[in-house]
Amino acid sequence: MLSRVWLIALLTLVVAAAAGGAEGGFLRRSGTELLLDGKPLRLVAVNKFDLFLRYLKGGDERKQAQEALASAAAHGFTAIRFSGVGFYPVDMKNWPRQEAWWGAFDALVADAQQAGVRLIPVVNWNTSLFPDMAQECVLDMLGAPDSRSWQYLELYARQLVARYRDNETILFWELSNELNLGADLGPMRPYGYEGLNWVDLGTSYMRLRRDNYTSDDMIGYMARLAGAIRSVDSNHLIATGNSAPRPAAQHMRRQQGEMDWTPDSLDDLAAYMRDTNADPIDLISIHFYSEHDNMRFGNTDPLSAKALAQLKEAADRVGKPLYIGETGDNYEQRPDTPFLRDVLDTATRLKIPLTLVWQWDLPGDPNDVNPTRTPAAVEMMERANAAMGGG
């Protein structure tokens, strides 16, 4: 752990090095380009899922988050994606205590602004959070505006967005995390399934039949949530937080009672992207990992990122900017990170505006990226930022 004196000194250096990193107005979209201060955005930055949760806990937990924030900024990673809400119901216990909850969020935003770091809060990371709080199922939240779970979510989203709608430290809002990966799986689990069921943390005992949902259920829900956010905040752009569509996503969407894993064509991919990123959603989010998202369109090399070209082409057909909300490598098996290298090289060549690596300074996590544990990855990210003109 860093000493408090060292932390203050580092934050001072960061402000000098990142002069106005959180200045330049709000992020804007022009066709398939993202513009910040009138210039095309080109940036490699990071995820830190637990950033706000550590601020909320206080003490040493907050100190770790502050150190991670300062360290990211010092290395030129001037945007951080994180969960802007609790993960389990137990994490929400201080939500009714407005001073404790929003005081922690205000402190995070203030520290980020001082460090020159933009923030990408995910409004609802764990899809089951609000249904578990309401003792309902996911489909209630997605499809029933009068459900308790939707009312919980809408209230929280409106509180969060209204509080920071005029703050340029917020880069943009994300609605969820990988909601698309849970869609259209009903035929595989017709009676329910186990998923993040930690009853001691406030969850339901099991996921039930009504926790399944389709892409079309998701599309309606996303439109409703994005519309609620847009009605409060006209300054910030909105993204879904989705992963790259499954290689068979459009076929799965059209399935009739059984799974259809037929690989999608480029036309299918573009149609799925169009429908799942309809207005008022501004940006097309993908998460891109080895052996999950890259094995499509003829690619058989698990360490190749060439499928990014087809994903970018599909997004261009939709007419909205595509960014990589998560990517990374197996740092224990491949310390030289060949997949991440190809992702960064390909993103640079394709002029993808934003690439966010999973995940920054999470002690004990196998995906932890930091200068001590994964120096090759950090240096590679810094070089990519220099090549893009970001950082």
Located regions from the model:
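Bacterial N-terminal signal peptides
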Residues: 6-16
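Aromatic-lined substrate-binding rim segments of carbohydrate-active enzymes
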Residues: 60-133, 138, 161, 212-239, ...
